[in-house]
Amino acid sequence: LEAAADFAKALGSSFVIITVIEPYSYTNLSEYRPESIDQYDSRVKEMAQERLEIARELVEKKDINCEVVAFKSFSPAEAIIDAANEYNCDLIFMASHGRQGFAAVLLGSETQKVLTHSKIPVMVYR
């Protein structure tokens, strides 16, 4: 995040930080979950807001205009692209998280999905 903020500052750009919240899963197992849909929604929204506020503080310390937003989606890559389009972003700045081995196969790469499907340029920071 700090590298993205430095990049935006150098260009005199504003900043939109998003986090993606996974919706409550309505699987057969959801009836065995220890929390209700409302409890889940409240908990994940609170966690998202905490993360976003930490990020906002870091960016605003660099005197950069910043907006933070949480999107709800089962597909983080799709939500990132939708957010970038909705906020008329000129660039999507993403970290390249090096998941390795079996986890990479199971989880896939959200960064790769954004790179593949976004019509907005994507900068990957490693």
List the predicted regions and their residue ranges.
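Structural beta-alpha unit
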Residues: 57-92
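Short, flexible loop segments at boundaries between secondary-structure elements
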Residues: 120-126
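Short, well-ordered secondary-structure micro-motifs
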Residues: 27-30, 78-81, 104-106
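Glycine-rich, Arg-bearing micro-motifs that act as flexible, cationic patches
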Residues: 91-116
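Small/aliphatic-rich secondary-structure junction motif
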Residues: 1-35, 58-67
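Short, hinge-like loop/turn segments at secondary-structure boundaries
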Residues: 33-36, 84-87, 110-111
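A short acidic, glycine-rich active-site loop
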Residues: 36-50
